[in-house]
């Protein structure tokens, strides 16, 4: 099975074509392949009984090889008398039935409907050298003559590189003239060219254009074939254009990668599809580092299913770190997509082999090593496919990672980010079937741990009385992992969670074992409206947490939405937490100017602001207080240290963990005002 490449890169294709033809000159037309590479397509669309017209035969051996394999009724024409004379002398004795005539293909003298096949190897490309009006007029006459001399049901079979203006012309002209149009990518020709021109990284894909003539067609018939796979049928010419263009663009990417090192530039990203499928089967990130002694040349790393969301595989910085540890100059990082079936790692390698080879540096002769985390492709089980009016399609999945079973909530609008994750434990019950249980002591998102320290600070250090319940507001529920942890670890906390999406509450209860009781309840409401109502009704909380993501992925700040940092909302929070309370938010910001603006807004409202930046993630936890004593980082560290140690004790006392949850000293060293 072949994989159809679709690149996300943009290139100036015209410059590339110009370089290709300038470099090769007259030898450019050797690129179209000989009989051996083309025979599969020739025998598929041309039969020995056909009356064949060879358009612009030149000195090509194609018609001779066809004659020798049983195609006897072949008429060759060429505008050059020298070429015709030479071919007659060469074939008179050995191929007596084959005809060679000097004739202009744009003004042929044959009667109407003389042939059942018109074969064109590169002649169209030679005629259509540019897109000037005079050239287009010549090409239009060429095709009118082909159709005039062709019987109904006959076929034009053209071997072409399909430059953009040629493709556009064919897609416009042929359907209008009642021709069924099929375009097939000739992988055999392309592979042979690469082998014959191993030192030349400048390559182009070759296509077979098959246009079948009908008296009339009620609707256009447009098809594309990738190699020897079944045809993909389209309803519009733009879809067929896109299929051809995607192959050409991918070739340009592969050529660029063969000719140059992209160290210091962005990664190159390529999706691999099965023909006729719109969703990718694989995504490949290609990254380079400068040549250095001791580095391997090139390797591919296959990410097991379910692991693609981890930082080291899902971010450019993480993949750079992976490349450093792999110790290769070029690394192709391959991720496997959900809703696809993969059997064994060896079969995945075999399926990827040609695509991975196409991305290699020029001149590479060594076998390409395949790296992974184990000997299989990983395990991913979809528990449910759902839809949210707010967040769109989502999945609940279980994956195996490092010997653990993890249950995840994934939004398909941003499917390389885990929205919620829980550790699933298997509970063995004597005489009964094993039961799965969510481990509430597992915090998948590291930022939840640092928010929990803040809650510990607000509910114990700030308010030491143990017999009084402290109120905590969490805006943003998701799968409920943070709320379940706080509820289990901090018995003094009375938690209110606000979630705008009712589907998320169902997901949290049914798949993440979220349970409401007298110390924990969920309100379905807009978080901003709820905050405003609390302020208006004089409702106070000891801790307020914003753990909300933005649905607009185009912005440089994905958490929280910018509306949550409006001065009016922050003023409401200031009043709600009172003199002793704490406000915490998870800030995820790639745009430094937006981050600065967010921090400035917080400083304008709150007397004391402190932050902790997670080492590998871009998450940053911001702590805000009204208490003047927190104006120094020393005071923050003193009380956060007490809170951190208290949280470690709490998780052990409640049997959520047997070890400390937080490295207190490390955490305190990175706290900043």
Swiss-Prot record:
UniProt-listed Gene3D superfamilies: Vaccinia Virus protein VP39 (3.40.50.150)
EC number(s) on file: 2.1.1.-
A Pfam family matched in the record: Methyltransf_31
Coiled coil: none
GO molecular function: protein-lysine N-methyltransferase activity
Keyword Transferase attached: yes
Keyword Methyltransferase assigned: yes
PROSITE patterns: CPSASE_2
Catalysis: reaction(s): L-lysyl-[protein] + S-adenosyl-L-methionine = N(6)-methyl-L-lysyl-[protein] + S-adenosyl-L-homocysteine + H(+); N(6)-methyl-L-lysyl-[protein] + S-adenosyl-L-methionine = N(6),N(6)-dimethyl-L-lysyl-[protein] + S-adenosyl-L-homocysteine + H(+); N-terminal glycyl-L-lysyl-L-glutamyl-[protein] + 3 S-adenosyl-L-methionine = N-terminal N,N,N-trimethyl-glycyl-L-lysyl-L-glutamyl-[protein] + 3 S-adenosyl-L-homocysteine + 3 H(+)
Superkingdom of the organism of origin: Eukaryota
Top-rank EC class of the record's enzyme: transferase
Record-level GO BP terms: methylation
Keywords: Methyltransferase, Multifunctional enzyme, Transferase
Signal peptide positions (record): none
Family: Belongs to the methyltransferase superfamily.
Function: Dual methyltransferase. It catalyzes N-terminal methylation of target proteins via its C-terminus. It catalyzes dimethylation on lysine residues of target proteins via its N-terminus.
Protein name: eEF1A lysine and N-terminal methyltransferase homolog
Protein species of origin: Drosophila melanogaster
Taxonomic path: Eukaryota, Metazoa, Ecdysozoa, Arthropoda, Hexapoda
